[in-house]
Curated annotation (Swiss-Prot):
Signal peptide: none
Pfam families the record matches: Fer4_12, Mob_synth_C, Radical_SAM
BP GO terms, sorted: Mo-molybdopterin cofactor biosynthetic process
Source organism of this protein record: Pseudomonas putida (strain ATCC 47054 / DSM 6125 / CFBP 8728 / NCIMB 11950 / KT2440)
Main function: Catalyzes the cyclization of GTP to (8S)-3',8-cyclo-7,8-dihydroguanosine 5'-triphosphate.
Name by which UniProt lists this protein: GTP 3',8-cyclase
Amino acid sequence: MEQNSRALIDGFNRKIDYLRMSVTDRCDFRCVYCMAEDMQFLPRQQILSLEELFQVAERFVALGTRKIRLTGGEPLVRQGIVDLCGRIAALPGLRELCLTSNGSQLGRLAQPLFDAGVTRLNISLDSLDADRFKQLTRTGDLAQVIAGIDAARQAGFKRTKLNCVVLKGRNDHELVDLVRFAIERELDITFIEEMPLGVISEHERGESFCSSDEVRARLAEQFTLVESTESSMGPARYWRLAEAANTRVGFISPHSHNFCATCNRVRLTVEGRLLLCLGNEHSVDLKHVLRAHPGNPERLEKAIRDSLHLKPYRHHFEVGGDVQILRFMNMTGG
């Protein structure tokens, strides 16, 4: 394996080479598992500027980061996002620049993003029923999202992945249809267990929880699943479909099969806090460092390195228990 003498290694000897960066807390959807319907967003002066986001990305890549994922909120509602993507994609040593989107803006931005150097897209799709999609997203238009998915394919994106958060009693009866949709378009699809982030009112998390094992068992009734050793440098575990060579089915299972032992990532919130673990509040304020010491990459690098001693071995998510993390997913970076 390629080694970088400046690589980031945490206290449990895990190499940190994957950074997830939230570029905005704003979104044109209000998904029931992600944020409150009347969400109050941060004032502009409290969030990182595009230049500050780039400076953090640049420093992480210099320290051995090989994959960066831009998230939100919805990253494509941030003005200047395409130019930011182009600057980050050009950083020497970065292998992948990925972006997670709800798909609503891809009809107009898929081609510019591809041309800017974004290598892969993840697109959220929790239902193929227009009414249910509207219920789950509160404001989303299914036809617009599907048009965005198709625009991404036409732009030239490969290995585009659909993300589906599975909620028992709300969309779990659509699992097979969602896989068939992915097969038709030669997409990957990942089913995600809901994470206990933020206080929500639309459903009781303990009652809506659907484990990855249950999802996989249902899919196995319709498809031949072959376990794969492939990795996307993230937490998903993949299965191949004997019936469809161009589609992989993944599972992200923070509850039933936590992936902490091999965790290789940290997250930057839009307000500049470096989160060492999705399931803990341990963080370091990089915005303060950036603004107190402008143009000083050495101070930023020291803050990043010093933060690693805060990274815990694992999270302690519990199904149906009290909400352990009060921040919403749109604040964390979905």
